[in-house]
């Protein structure tokens, strides 16, 4: 079980801060990030390629694009501050880089929540080998 947890952390925690983003996802979707989004479609989880498979996967694609815009802020390792206020995620850093990364995660979590009804179990543990169509531009 411990090995499974470590693998799951490595898979979903590659961008942003695993626990912070996972907490945002849980608040907005009611789903555990590791079980539901670590390997989903072509973009949720490690890396991404091809065309997003559905609206849920497009949320992860958009997050990848957002991270690309703040790449100088080291989004894969950033630890930011945020809070939940009246059901909203509020990014609280004065540091512009940390706030930008938080906003990427915030937007993705909100998107996942707004599209939770598009979640398709057929895209859980989806093989990247199926992601061969040309990717959209960010």
UniProtKB/Swiss-Prot annotation:
Cellular component GO terms held in the UniProt record: extracellular region
Organism of provenance: Vipera aspis zinnikeri (Viper)
SMART domains the record matches: PA2c
PANTHER family, alphabetized: PHOSPHOLIPASE A2 FAMILY MEMBER, PHOSPHOLIPASE A2, MEMBRANE ASSOCIATED
Protein name: Acidic phospholipase A2 inhibitor vaspin A chain
Locations listed in the record: Secreted
Cysteine pairings via disulfide bonds: 42-131, 44-60, 59-111, 65-138, 66-104, 73-97, 91-102
Entry keyword annotation includes Secreted: yes
Entry's Gene Ontology BP terms: arachidonate secretion; lipid catabolic process; negative regulation of T cell proliferation; phospholipid metabolic process
Keyword presence, Cell membrane: no
SUPFAM superfamilies from the UniProt entry: Phospholipase A2, PLA2
Tissue specificity field: Expressed by the venom gland.
Family in the record: Belongs to the phospholipase A2 family. Group II subfamily. D49 sub-subfamily.
GO molecular-function term, one example from the UniProt record: calcium ion binding
Signal peptide per UniProt: 1-16
Known role: Heterodimer: postsynaptic neurotoxin.
Self-association state and partner proteins as the record states: Heterodimer of a weakly toxic basic protein having phospholipase A2 activity (B chain) and a non-toxic acidic protein functioning as its inhibitor but which potentiates its lethal potency and neurotoxicity (A chain).
Residue ranges, annotated region (Important for membrane-damaging activities in eukaryotes and bacteria): 121-133
Swiss-Prot/TrEMBL keywords: Disulfide bond, Neurotoxin, Phospholipase A2 inhibitor, Postsynaptic neurotoxin, Secreted, Signal, Toxin
Pfam families referenced in this protein's UniProt entry, alphabetically: Phospholip_A2_1 (PF00068)
InterPro entries per UniProt: PLipase_A2 (IPR001211), PLipase_A2_Asp_AS (IPR033112), PLipase_A2_dom (IPR016090), PLipase_A2_dom_sf (IPR036444)
């Amino acid at each position: 079980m411990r090995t499974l947890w470590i693998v799951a952390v490595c898979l979903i925690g590659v961008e942003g801060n695993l626990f912070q983003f996972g907490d945002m996802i849980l608040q907005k979707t009611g789903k555990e990030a590791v079980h539901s989004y670590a390997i989903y479609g072509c973009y949720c989880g490690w890396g991404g390629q091809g065309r997003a498979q559905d609206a849920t996967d497009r949320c992860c694609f958009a997050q990848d694009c957002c991270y690309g815009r703040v790449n100088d802020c080291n989004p894969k390792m950033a630890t930011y501050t945020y809070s939940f206020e009246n059901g909203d995620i509020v990014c609280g850093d004065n540091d512009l880089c940390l706030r930008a990364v938080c906003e990427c995660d915030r937007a993705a979590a909100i998107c996942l929540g707004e599209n939770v009804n598009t979640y398709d179990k057929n895209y859980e543990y989806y093989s990247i080998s199926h992601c061969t169509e040309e990717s959209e531009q960010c």
